[in-house]
Curated annotation (Swiss-Prot):
Single GO BP term: plant-type primary cell wall biogenesis
Protein's gene: CSFL1
Lineage of the organism: Eukaryota, Viridiplantae, Streptophyta, Embryophyta, Tracheophyta
Subcellular location: Golgi apparatus membrane
Source organism of the structure: Oryza sativa subsp. japonica (Rice)
Protein name per the record: Putative mixed-linked glucan synthase 1
First-listed, main subcellular location of the protein, grouped into a coarse class: Golgi
Amino-acid positions noted as binding substrate in the UniProt annotation, renumbered to this chain: 381, 383
CC per GO annotation: Golgi membrane; plasma membrane
Length: 860
């Protein structure tokens, strides 16, 4: 079907490009449709057939077959290389040979783990127009979960924009609800949500009237121009000015919330002698944490809170008012209903492990079951927003398409993470396109991608630990469970579970939130509710691991569920990423440490049952062991120290053949990488940044994670990973100020040492070539060694810019400094090292002659 014949989708009078039926896979130079006959047959049946809700594409054979051949060829080359090395064992430096051999074997093993799951990349494209044809009036309910903790580390402006973008999403307003979990229990977050509920009465109808994209006001107003898709272009300018003015006032109120609450509390405390409480606007104590900590009102010790800020709307549209003095924006033809909005802060008590984000998600899962009980759940981090207003419709294409296409067996749909405000060169590989568009896309050909923590739609019953329908109906499985021991003692919550198993149902809110419901909600948010249950193990998000997202997805895959990796244009969701070097390193430290925790736990992929696809098992094994190989990379990067303490060294003899093997296997992996760049649709810059940041992590962060894990195994104590802090551009006035800020931490030291060693090794190599001549054996060996050193320094180039701080804006300074350092080391070697090495060589030769004479004895 050509683009000219695309079917138009109108929702609230809006044209959405995401809703066109794209069927041009055959025209793509990389991807080809695999279900073309199915699609064409359904659409050519005079309306009797129903087209599928998504289309599937595979990589063309002209790319896939050479790609697979190269993988096989490199595997053969690696085996031949190992066999050759064993036959030519270096006995002069046995310890070095043994160490490098073990490292190379692990390199080969980890490469196989990484490469095998990539053999059949599949792309699945949702057809939102087909969804509208088949489910125009019966889309199922969705509960949207948003998590946040600290309004400082996670700026509150991000959170309010996330909530506003969700409230304005293009989905039936009476069929989804939004829940915010504030794990800090702060009044600032609660009153920010009160402000959001008020501003949404203006923002959401404005979005519907003019079909604006994106629907996060901060990002929308930051855009310079965009195509107009609404139906009243003549009113856009005046409405835009009015709404923007209101938004700026809204931001002022949000920014001043902390001081406003403090001033109010000071006034109330002055009236109540001896009190130092934090007061709400209605003159009552805030039940959460106070500015001045007190008993039952501090971090880690406060009551649970559930507040419905926006009630569930009616099923019938409610049109707004015409323009007037009180209502300057004309919403007379616009549905002004708002989705349900709920604020949650779970109870915290000393002596309980609250399990961070996973614990908060499980509380929201229980509370939402009582208040809305939608059969599908989407979760967001507090700094991710809805970038494509139809983002909630896209995953439904995969969840609702049965027809033998696996929809009913799909546990979750994962969208790639896309980021704003990353520096143009993506210095620290924040976009991570190689992982999202390469690795995750390739898993679509197996059981599906892993769960990545945000931008994910779940089937509620899959979170409850129910197995996929191929092993029995969900309702039957739930009835057969030991419900009290598995899910807890709340009969109200248990009563919602069978309804949650019906994927076709909409939201059915409680008629009245009376005292009995309030009591149930308090019980569900209590610390003790999960005692003696399966929450955090077989039910909900998994506990006691830093990467609870990956392990939660793994639990579903091992039960036989499938997942889907879906990408739409424009991107469904966008968020923020840490552009500061230290924060980025701490982020990947948490990820790598959590991966190792997964390997050394009952969630090890080797322990999964037969329902886990063999190559999916390999993929999870790779995800949980990748930091281990970096220990060998770290020591390889320190090998240049040998240039500083000896005249020459050999890892393997004969060196010439060793070098040929090495060049061959390295060249092949880069050619394979180019094929992946092609089918993943990424740029060479993306690939290069991925290579560079992998080396940066391998020289400090990943070995540190291995050390942490070793200490945990020895001592039995858990690992604490700090929350990645994010800063708004407005806080400093410079969009990329964090990029040039140096935060010195011990985590930087190993990589700095590696850089110093390799710069010194380059200097020694230059000195050797100058002292002995580039054509002599010491000279040309020095030049070859220098190639390795320079390659390491090129990979560590982004790190070097990061530790330079403001000087990183002038890369020329780095090159000049390195050139001067190399020249200084080379000069010192020529002046002191070369004569010393010559003297040692002379002494060694003399000793050799004496030894030979003593062995042969006197002649005659």
């Amino acid at each position: 079907m050509s683009a000219a014949a695309a079917v138009t989708s109108w929702t609230n009078g809006c044209w959405s490009p995401a809703a066109t039926r794209v069927n041009d896979g055959g025209k793509d130079d990389v991807w080809v449709a695999v279900d073309e006959a199915d699609v064409s047959g359904a659409r050519g049946s005079d309306g009797g057939g129903r087209p599928p809700l998504f289309q599937t594409y595979k990589v063309k054979g002209s790319i896939l077959h050479p790609y697979r051949f190269l993988i096989l060829a490199r595997l053969i080359a690696i085996v031949a290389f190992f066999a050759w090395r064993i036959r030519h064992k270096n006995r002069d430096g046995a310890w070095l040979w043994t160490m490098s051999m073990v490292g190379d074997v692990w390199f080969g093993f980890s490469w196989v783990l990484n490469q095998l799951p990539k053999q059949s990349p599949i792309k699945r494209v949702p057809d939102i127009a087909a969804l509208a044809d088949r489910h125009s009036g019966d889309l199922p309910g969705v509960d949207v979960f948003v998590t946040t903790v600290d309004p400082v580390d996670e700026p509150i402006l991000y959170t309010v924009n996330t909530i506003l973008s969700i409230l304005a999403a293009d989905y039936p307003v009476d069929r989804y609800a939004c829940y915010l979990s504030d794990d800090g229990g702060t009044l600032v977050h609660y009153e920010a949500m009160v402000e959001v509920a008020k501003f949404a009465e203006l923002w959401v109808p404005f979005c519907r009237k003019h079909c604006v994209e994106p629907r996060s006001p901060e990002n929308y107003f930051a855009m310079k121009t965009q195509a107009y898709k609404g139906g009243v272009p003549g009113e856009l300018m005046s409405d835009h000015r009015r709404v923007r003015r209101e938004y700026e006032e809204f931001k002022v109120r949000i920014d001043s919330l902390s001081s406003t609450i403090r001033q109010r509390s000071d006034v109330y405390n002055a009236k109540h002698a001896g009190e130092n409480a934090t007061w709400m606007a209605d003159g009552t104590h805030w039940p959460g944490t106070w500015f001045e900590p007190a008993d039952n009102h501090q971090r880690g010790k406060h009551a649970g809170i559930v507040q419905v800020l926006l009630n569930h709307p009616s099923c019938k549209p409610r049109l707004g008012l015409a323009a007037s003095a009180e209502n300057p924006v004309d919403f007379s033809g616009v549905d002004v209903r708002l989705p349900m909005l709920v604020y949650i802060s779970r109870e915290k008590r000393p002596g309980y492990n609250h399990q961070k984000k996973a614990g908060a998600m499980n509380v929201m899962l229980r509370v939402s079951a009582l208040l809305s009980n939608a059969p599908f759940v989407i979760n967001f981090d507090g700094d991710h927003y809805v970038n494509n207003s139809q983002a909630f419709r896209a995953p439904m294409c995969f969840m609702l398409d049965g027809r033998g296409r696996g929809g009913e067996n799909t546990a979750f749909v994962q969208f790639p993470q896309r980021f704003d405000d990353v520096d143009p060169t993506d210095r620290y590989a924040n976009h991570n396109r190689v992982f999202f568009d390469g690795t995750m896309l390739s898993l679509n050909g197996l059981q599906g991608p892993s769960y990545l923590g945000t931008g994910t739609m779940f089937r509620r019953v899959a979170l409850y630990g129910v197995e996929p329908p191929r092993w029995g109906a969900a309702a039957s499985q739930i009835k057969a469970m030991d419900i009290a021991n598995k899910f807890g003692s709340s009969t109200s919550f248990v009563g919602t579970m069978l309804d949650g198993a019906n994927q076709e149902r909409s939201i059915t809110p409680l008629a009245v939130l009376d005292e009995s419901v309030a009591g149930d909600l308090a019980a569900l948010t209590a610390c003790a509710y999960e005692d003696g249950t399966s929450w955090g193990r077989d039910v909900g998000w998994v506990y006691n691991i830093a990467t609870e997202d990956v392990v939660t997805g793994f639990r579903m895959h091992r039960q036989g569920w499938r997942s889907v990796y879906a990408s739409v244009e424009p991107a469904a969701f966008r968020g923020t990423a840490p552009i500061n070097l230290t924060e980025r390193l701490y982020q990947i430290l948490r990820w790598s440490g959590g991966s190792l925790e997964m390997f050394f736990s009952h969630s090890n992929a080797l322990l999964a049952g037969r329902r886990l696809h063999p190559l999916q098992r390999v993929a999870y094994l790779n995800m949980s062991t990748y930091p281990i190989v970096t220990v060998f990379i770290f020591f390889y990067n320190l090998f240049p120290v040998m240039w500083l303490i000896s005249e020459q060294y050999y890892i393997q003899r004969p060196f010439g053949e060793y070098l040929l093997y090495l060049v061959a296997v390295i060249a092949m992996i880069h050619v394979i990488g180019m094929f992946e760049v092609k089918w993943a649709g990424i740029t060479l810059l993306d690939w290069c940044r991925n290579e560079q940041f992998y080396m940066i992590g391998s020289t400090g962060v990943y070995p540190t994670a291995v050390l942490y894990m070793a200490l945990k195994l020895v001592t039995g104590k858990g690992i604490y990973f700090r929350l990645t802090s994010k800063q708004t551009a407005a806080s400093s006035g410079d969009k990329f100020a964090d990029l040039y800020t140096v935060r010195w931490v011990p985590l930087l030291i190993p990589t700095i040492v590696i850089m110093v060693v390799n710069v010194a090794a380059v200097g020694v190599a230059v000195g050797k070539a100058a002292a002995w001549g580039p054509l002599t054996e010491p000279g040309w060996l020095a030049v070859l060694g220098m190639v390795f050193n320079v390659w390491i320094l090129v990979l560590l180039y982004p790190f070097a810019l990061g530790v330079m701080g403001q000087w990183g804006k002038r890369p020329a300074v780095l090159f000049v400094a390195m050139a001067m350092a190399v020249a200084a080391v080379a000069a010192m070697y020529v002046a002191f090292g070369a004569p010393y090495q010559a003297e040692l060589s002379g002494v060694a030769a003399s000793l050799g002659k004496v030894a030979a004479a003593s062995l042969t004895g006197p002649s005659g």
